[in-house]
Amino acid sequence: FESNGFEGASVRAICSQANANIAAINYYFGSKETLYGEVVKHVFLASDGSETMPRLAHNPMEPIAQLCAWVEWHVTRYLPRQNSTVATFIRRELANPSPLLQEIVDVTILQSLEALKEIVAAILPQSTSEDELNHHCLQINGPTMVAAILQPINTRMPGFESGNMPIKALVRQAQIWSLARLKAGGAEISERWFALD
């Protein structure tokens, strides 16, 4: 499924490569769609890290620290040095959505955005509208997702490759951008949060 997508993969070829019995696959999964669903769940949940995902409830008195922790979790989850299986599945689903796209969104992306939204809501002024709050969250989430999804293109642009920039530096850059965005949106954020490590 990773190399050929839902439409391009055949159960027969998968069974041949996995040295598995087609009858057993049909018995346990019943259909190609169900098998694909289980594979996708495994890929996303194995890399999900939802148990370690920072949430406001973990440190409600320090929402800015929780935002920085969430950004670190998010960047390290989606920006590995080599192409990630999760990003490959996301690219395939965007290009040719399977019947499971909504479930993928619900199980992975939506849960992390909801956790981010709680944190961001605790940082921004109470007068911030729901639309503004959502926009801030999408702008914090988006650059990392885009970089992960476009990784095959980014590696082919001379002079714009991510190179050997340490993941810690990428995380800190994303944290500063996120904090600056919220400060521009009216959040009171001390300059100490913008200091480079």
Tell what function each PLM region has.
Residues 3-34, 38, 42:
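Helix-turn-helix
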Residues 37, 41, 45, 72, ...:
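Generic alpha-helical structural context detector
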Residues 87-89, 102-110, 119-175, 186-197:
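Hydrophobic/aromatic-rich alpha-helical bundle segments in the mid-to-C-terminal region
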Residues 43-51, 55:
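Conserved phosphoryl-transfer catalytic core
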Residues 52-84, 133-140:
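Hydrophobic alpha-helical connector segments
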Residues 32, 39, 43, 67, ...:
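Hydrophobic/aromatic residues within well-ordered alpha-helical segments
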